Every structure is written in C-alpha cells, then in structure tokens.
C-alpha cells in the first residue's frame, strides 16, 4: 500500500530520510504517527527508525544530540525550529525485561523486521518510507480496518516485556475506539497483576488519557473486565461500575480534573487527597480535584461557596451534577458569580498596609482577623468594595473592641 499524499509532517522530514538513504541505509517513519496518518488523525510525534547505527547517523548529520544513544536514539537537528528536530532510532532487538518496563539491554540490528516485531500492537508496527510506501509485516492494515487491537506475536510475551502495554491497550480502546482481539485481551487479564511492577505515575498518564478519550466507557469497561483495577492504588470496581451506569451515556469529560472528580464522587469512604497522594499527582491537581468533589456535595451555589470555588470549578461541577441526573438550576452559578463584587481577595481596594497606616495597627492576628472579616462582608455584599466604606467599617470594628 502507498499513501496517496504524505502529511506535511512527513514531507518536512523527507530530506532526513532521503539523506540517510543516500548513504546506503534504510530509514522509515514508524509507530503511532504512521497509524494516525492511516486513520486520518492528527500527528503528534514523528518517529524515525533506521538501519544506520548511532555513530553512523552522527557521521551523516553535522548537528546531533545524544538523547538516548545507549538505546540507539540520536536527535538530529535538521533545522533551526524544534519542529525540524527528529529522534532517529536504530533498528534493535531487546533482551529480557527484568523490571517489566524496560529491556535490560538492546542490540542494534540492520533488519527492519527484527525491530518491528518487538513493538506492542500490529497497528503500531507499520513502517513508511519517504515515498509513502507502507510496510505492514504483521497484518496491521486488516486490524486497522476492523478497528481491532492485536498484540504483535505472543501477547503474553508483549505484556511480560512491558506491563504498561495493558493500560495502553485500554487507552487505545478509548481514544481510537478499537476493540481488543480475544487472545490479546486474555493475555491482558492474565498479566494484569504485573501492573504492580509499574510506577503509578506512568499508569496515571495512561489512565488519564483513557478518561479523556471519546470512548472512555470502552476503556473503563476493559479496566473492570480485565481485573486490572485490582492493581491500581485504592481503586474500587463498584465505583467504576457506578460511573458507567449513572453518568449520561453521551457525556465527555472537559479535563482531567473533572474526570477524576467524577470517579471519586462514586467512591465510598474516600479521602480524596490521601487517595491522590498514592497516585503521586501534583499538589495543585490534588487540590483542584478535591475542590470539585467537595463542591459536588453542595445543594446550591451561594455567594460564599461560589467565591471560594470560583466559576470555572462551579461550571465543571454543574456539568457533572447534570450528567449524573441531578436536578439543578443551570444558570445559578453564572448569576451568583455576577453578583460578586470580588472574585479574589487581591481585588479588595484596601490592603493590610493601608489599615496599618490609617489606624496605627501592627502586623498580627488582630489585623488578620480584620482583613478576613472585611473580605467576608464584601463577598456577602454586606459591605461595598470601596475605600471609604471599608475604612468606616474598620473604624466601627475597632471602636467596638475598645
């Protein structure tokens, strides 16, 4: 099969492949970029594989950087822009995977087949030369046509080599709307316990992409049916089933925070921040998700809660409430937000220093208490956010304390 037209990303990289070819070596576009071209999807990364060894690539191109030379990868700087920087990796075979994630060592080879047969799934094992000729050694085109995910060679071996491939399969089911071939799924289920060997950070990335996929329901269903959920920190299959059955069928998550919050609203006896600490996410992400889960429990928005959580989070929460079938006033959050004089305490027209100068106050608990009270009154519209009004109010507060 030959592509009728190369995508712009391949056209831009064409001279690199041609130059390698001129020196007597093979070079191909490989991996997900070729798959995405065949699916008519946007390309994110252009991966190039070659029969040339790393030192030979460095002899061909004047500007290179060793980014993973021990694994055969050299970054070729073909132009000034980052878009013209290409990672070029030598065809290779791999030894056993002691850690179930990375090979203990790699051997460079000249044979394309040897390189492609170590890849995870047939639809990721294509090669494409600089003229657009597709090389399909494992019947990936048939799988692509059938939207089917099949492991290259022995599925058990592929998942033994890299257990993260189990999560990748589920992610592809979600993002590409692929079904899993029977033997491949059976191997996923049989090897799901190996996910305990994989870092939670890597699993989180795959699970997060799964949740944001157009067919996230497929991915979550596979997570349950493969029993892989058992090997994810503090996961509950009942919560996953509730999300699948209780969330409206056409709902798609706006962002990662909303997706994880949706899951966690269905968990029982959950400490959100403690749960997310086990997933080693950032404090910022953890706080955002915890806020969404807390806000989900509110019956209605008022000035104080809207100010505390902010309109962005309020709208994300309202989307979840509606998707889970709760009857809410869809316009209330925006209406309440419009009634707020401030949306952050930095918008208060007077700062602590102003009060210190005006009333000879010193830094400390008393000043902090006054500032907090002023903020609360402005939020509740009990006090105008105006300098004279605030100074008058503070004066009253100080006189009452005498």
Curated annotation (Swiss-Prot):
GO terms for molecular function: ATP binding; CCA tRNA nucleotidyltransferase activity; magnesium ion binding; tRNA binding. CTP binds at residues 32, 35, 119, 162, 165, 168, 171. InterPro entries: Bact_CCA-adding_enz_type3_sf (IPR050264), CCA-adding_enz_C (IPR032810), CCA-adding_enz_firmicutes (IPR023068), NT_sf (IPR043519), PolA_pol_head_dom (IPR002646), PolyA_RNA-bd (IPR032828). Its cofactor is Mg(2+). It catalyses: a tRNA precursor + 2 CTP + ATP = a tRNA with a 3' CCA end + 3 diphosphate; a tRNA with a 3' CCA end + 2 CTP + ATP = a tRNA with a 3' CCACCA end + 3 diphosphate. ATP binds at residues 32, 35, 119, 162, 165, 168, 171. Mg(2+) binds at residues 45, 47. Its EC number is 2.7.7.72. GO terms for biological process: RNA repair; tRNA 3'-terminal CCA addition. NCBIfam families: PRK13299.1. Catalyzes the addition and repair of the essential 3'-terminal CCA sequence in tRNAs without using a nucleic acid template. Adds these three nucleotides in the order of C, C, and A to the tRNA nucleotide-73, using CTP and ATP as substrates and producing inorganic pyrophosphate. tRNA 3'-terminal CCA addition is required both for tRNA processing and repair. Also involved in tRNA surveillance by mediating tandem CCA addition to generate a CCACCA at the 3' terminus of unstable tRNAs. While stable tRNAs receive only 3'-terminal CCA, unstable tRNAs are marked with CCACCA and rapidly degraded. HAMAP family: CCA_bact_type3. This is CCA-adding enzyme. It comes from Lactococcus lactis subsp. cremoris (strain MG1363). The gene is cca.
């Amino acid at each position: 099969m030959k592509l009728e037209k190369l995508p712009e990303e391949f056209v831009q990289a064409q001279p690199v492949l041609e130059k390698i070819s001129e020196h007597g070596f093979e070079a191909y576009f490989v991996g997900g970029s070729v798959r995405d071209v065949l699916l008519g999807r946007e390309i994110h990364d252009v991966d190039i594989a070659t029969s040339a060894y790393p030192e030979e690539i460095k002899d061909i191109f004047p500007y290179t950087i060793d980014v993973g030379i021990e694994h055969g990868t050299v970054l070729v700087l073909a132009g000034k822009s980052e878009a013209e920087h290409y990672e070029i990796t030598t065809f290779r075979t791999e030894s056993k995977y002691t850690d179930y994630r990375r090979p203990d060592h790699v051997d460079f080879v000249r044979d394309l087949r040897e390189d492609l047969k170590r890849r995870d799934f047939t639809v990721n094992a294509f090669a494409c030369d600089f003229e657009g000729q597709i090389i399909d050694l494992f019947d990936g085109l048939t799988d692509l046509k059938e939207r089917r995910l099949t492991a290259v060679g022995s599925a058990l071996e592929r998942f033994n080599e890299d257990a993260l491939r189990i999560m990748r399969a589920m992610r592809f089911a979600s993002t590409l709307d692929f079904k899993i071939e029977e033997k491949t799924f059976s191997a996923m289920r049989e090897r799901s316990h190996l996910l305990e060997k994989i870092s939670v950070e890597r699993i989180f990335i795959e699970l997060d992409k799964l949740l944001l996929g157009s067919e996230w329901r497929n991915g979550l269903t596979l997570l349950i049916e493969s029993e892989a959920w058992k090997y994810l920190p503090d996961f509950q299959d009942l919560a996953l089933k509730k999300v699948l059955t209780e969330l409206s069928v056409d709902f798609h998550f706006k962002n990662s925070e909303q997706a994880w919050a949706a899951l966690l609203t269905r968990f029982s006896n959950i400490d959100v921040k403690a749960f997310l600490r086990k997933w080693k996410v950032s404090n910022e992400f953890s706080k955002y998700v915890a806020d969404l889960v807390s806000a989900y429990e509110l019956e209605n928005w008022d000035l104080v809660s809207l100010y505390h959580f902010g309109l962005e989070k309020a709208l994300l929460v309202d989307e979840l409430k509606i998707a889970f079938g709760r009857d809410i006033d869809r316009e209330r959050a925006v209406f309440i937000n419009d009634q707020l004089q401030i949306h952050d305490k930095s918008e208060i027209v007077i700062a602590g220093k102003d009060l210190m100068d005006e009333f000879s106050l010193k830094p400390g608990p008393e000043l902090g208490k006054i500032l907090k009270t002023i903020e609360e009154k402005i939020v509740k519209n009990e006090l105008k956010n105006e300098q004279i009004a605030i100074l008058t109010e503070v004066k009253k507060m100080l006189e009452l304390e005498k």
